């Protein structure tokens, strides 16, 4: 497999075509942004940590019967992925009220959400990622009712798997964002699941363990990302390595 040309550059990743039309190369860059790109920096090693965590989570999901676009790790910060037809939806599962849902609705910061809330936004920079309901999704032709039902079921299954996994490592999965695509008639998890797309709190202290550290200047971003990666990639506390 040989890298051919650049297909897409996002805020923190670049995607390349290869000589195999079914396979893309995804490179996690060291760029970090917040507030729709108004705040941006480059932090050496950040891309590697996100790639390691995403790779681990994708493999974990595959082991539990959830299809993802992940194929293989190529080198540090670089993975091979399936060529999906992406669905322009950002699917957010919220277990605890935090962030925009507290700013926009009468929830209290830290309020448990049981059952978890699924919020779906239209992935569109031009329209500033507005929230969608099912009817808007159908009217815009973004997904069929059957596809949306499957996406929601997968999102809740992933949430349960990751919440339990992280809980054993002393981390609360507050909320997280996923993207999905179509591959050979199947709905498949795409993009990434990392500290950039999850909101994580330390169970004991409530300390932020995600990109909020960068957004709001809460501490050393790289120290935080390195620590979270170590906890996610290690056995649960009390178990031998």
Swiss-Prot record:
GO molecular function terms noted in the UniProt entry: ATP binding; phosphoribosylaminoimidazolesuccinocarboxamide synthase activity
Uppermost EC category: ligase
Gene: purC
Transmembrane feature ranges: none
Annotated EC: 6.3.2.6
Coiled-coil residues: none
Signal peptide: none
Pfam families: SAICAR_synt
Keyword ATP-binding appears in the UniProt entry: yes
Stored InterPro entries: SAICAR_synt/ADE2_N, SAICAR_synt_PurC, SAICAR_synth, SAICAR_synthetase, SAICAR_synthetase_CS
Source organism per UniProt: Methanoculleus marisnigri (strain ATCC 35101 / DSM 1498 / JR1)
Entry protein name: Phosphoribosylaminoimidazole-succinocarboxamide synthase
